[in-house]
Each structure stands twice: as structure tokens, then as C-alpha cells.
């Protein structure tokens, strides 16, 4: 089986990661103790991707949980699915990273990293044919960002040919947790460009907007945000967990979505958007789902796809529906909005259908887009970074942990390069190539 090893780090990573497991257990009919409640072949057919079968028929998530302080771990353990994880797979320190990337990457995190790698190795040895890793973390804090990227680079060294997928929560302009977020995010981004294969970009501001605007929640909690994220994560991974026709593993996903190796930051969207505990009264049609999921208001990160162009995209539908109708709708979107797709990658939207809908819905769709407009996020973080880095504000917290200013400068220029690469492909037209097909296509 093509197993995926799940790793969650830091407070944010552990919270969205645990929520993800609640959703996945539910979809595969596994109760909080790891016992199977369902007799359905579809649910159990590819159960080994995320679960290891232990003695007595218990299914244990292939999950590694790490943090530099015990708090979040304790709440995961006492949470609804706390008993399902392997107790040895909780690895935590006592000191915390104090929102300092350098503590996570160089000092506190570096002391704990070997024990994390031991558990990762043990889990990897349990796999027949490991296809890759997925990491949940945020980029604004210290542990998920600093130690998360340290772990990613160590795994990259040890398993160079396995896929590395991340669910990365970027800091948001309006919803700020700490003042040094731009530093932490830029230092992490620098690492993710080099060491990750595919990054699903999430951010709290976009999630808050969805809660306010679409779900009409007046005071959304992190629980509501995590509900949205876990729905999206479940949608992104459903083609890996259930039998399906298209995008059935992490590598196929990457091949379909990544035209240039550095441009692997994806926007994700989900439809229909529902709030926690609500009942869906009306089944949406395939055209409605398609329209909703391409809507810029449905994107889980604060960048507007209308400000850029799609290099590639992938749409995953779930539920009983006709694949022909799905293909027609996707084609329809491309024809109607052709200026938002680069014309030099023909047929750049892939669609897939998985028969099992998520709990409580009869159909749903998940969207993954590689859009040049994601540069808005990097540009925003980089402006905040530069504003603080010029006067060297807060820098002593990082140099005090042994970091060099040079590393800041390198990270800054790597992120600026990334932004200009996105811009370059956004502006590129088919004309610039030296081919002549007799007709001469028109650029914009």
C-alpha cells in the first residue's frame, strides 16, 4: 500500500491535525479507540494509507505529534480521539519556543529533533511502500515554523525521493498573534521553497472572512476555523484514501500541479461551505458546486485569484455524480474565464471524482489551484519583514539563539525571487516562445 506519514507540530499544527484525524476516522468508520464500526469495503479498501493495523484489529493513525511544550499535547490526549494515537508518538519538550523561529530551528527544537526522527523512522519502517509525508504546522510561531521546517529538511535528507506535502497556516495581516510573525514566516518560507514538494497554503484571515461572510458567524472561534481546514484537508486527501480514478497519490498530484519546481504553493477552496453542526437542507448540483469552489470568496488564503492567472488547478468532487457532467462544468469554467488561465499550458485543470461524500453532505468539491496571485501573500509578508528588518527590530531574540543576520538576508531575497518568478509567469504569453503554429495565438 502507498502509505502517508502524518506529522503535526506546534500548537496550530496539533490543533488542525487532531481535527483532521477526527474527520478521517469518521469517514472510514473508525471509533475513537481504533475499532472498525463499518463493514463497507470502500471505507476499508485503502485504510492502510493513513492507518496501521495493530493487534486485535485496532487501527492506529500513522501520526507523529510534536511540540516544544506539553500544553497542546495534553489537550490532544484528553480530546475525543486522544486514545487512538500511539502513546510513543507524542514527543514534546518543556520549554516552549516562545514564538521564536530560531528556538524551534536551532536551539530547543534541535535538541528534540532526534527523538522525533526516531519515531518517524520507526513509522516509516512499518510501511510497505511509503509514498510520502504530510506536515501540519503554522509559519507564524516558533515550533511549527522553526522546528517544523527543521524536521522537513532532515526528512528530505533521509528520504530524498519521497513526497513532502505541507498544510501551512500563513500569518494574516489582520489576525496577528505576535509581532515577529513576518520574520518567522519568511524564514520558514525560505525553507519550504527548497525542501517541500507541495504546500497547501491556509491563512486565518481568509478563514475568518469565510466565517463572517459566508457562514454568517458573528464571533468565529478557532474551532470554527479548524472545522473549515479539516474539511479541506479531508477533501485534498480523499483521492488518496478512497479508490478513485484520478490523482490517486501525492506524486500524481504534484505532476499535475507543478509546472516549475519552486512554484509549489497552492490555494485551496471547498464547497459547499457549512458551519459546524449545521444540516445541509438542499443538495447542491454539480454546476453550483463548481461555481462555488472557483469563487474567490471560497479560497482559504488571503489572495485573490482574479489578480493573477492559474498555471494549473485540480478539482476533486465527492459523491454520486456523473463524471461527464463534472468534465463539462470544468471545461465551461475554463472557457468562460479563459483570461484567468495561462494559455501556454493547455488543459491545465484536472478533475477527479470519489464516490464517498463527506459526513452530512451528499456531494462536495475541493479545489487546489496553482495561481500566480499567491504572490500577494508572500509580497505582504515580505513588506512587513523588510519594515522590521531595516531597523533590525527584535533581531536580538534571533541572534541570541546563534542565528546570523546573513540568514535573514538570504531568506528575504529568496522570497522576493519567488514573488518575481510568479510575476514573470503571470505576464508570460505564448507569443514569447519561438514556435510558429501557422495561426499565431494572441496573448493578453
Curated annotation (Swiss-Prot):
Organism: Daucus carota
Gene3D superfamilies associated with the record: Helix hairpin bin (1.10.287.600), Tubulin/FtsZ, C-terminal domain (3.30.1330.20), Tubulin/FtsZ, GTPase domain (3.40.50.1440)
Name of the featured protein: Tubulin beta-2 chain
Feature: compositional bias, Acidic residues: 429-444
Entry's transmembrane regions: none
UniProt keyword terms in alphabetical order: Cytoplasm, Cytoskeleton, GTP-binding, Magnesium, Metal-binding, Microtubule, Nucleotide-binding
Pfam family, one: Tubulin
PROSITE patterns, alphabetized: TUBULIN, TUBULIN_B_AUTOREG
GO cellular component: cytoplasm; microtubule
Cofactor (UniProt): Mg(2+)
Quaternary organization: Dimer of alpha and beta chains. A typical microtubule is a hollow water-filled tube with an outer diameter of 25 nm and an inner diameter of 15 nM. Alpha-beta heterodimers associate head-to-tail to form protofilaments running lengthwise along the microtubule wall with the beta-tubulin subunit facing the microtubule plus end conferring a structural polarity. Microtubules usually have 13 protofilaments but different protofilament numbers can be found in some organisms and specialized cells.
Cellular compartments annotated: Cytoplasm, Cytoskeleton
Homology family: Belongs to the tubulin family.
Keyword Transcription: no
Annotated function: Tubulin is the major constituent of microtubules, a cylinder consisting of laterally associated linear protofilaments composed of alpha- and beta-tubulin heterodimers. Microtubules grow by the addition of GTP-tubulin dimers to the microtubule end, where a stabilizing cap forms. Below the cap, tubulin dimers are in GDP-bound state, owing to GTPase activity of alpha-tubulin.
One GO MF term attached to the UniProt entry: GTPase activity
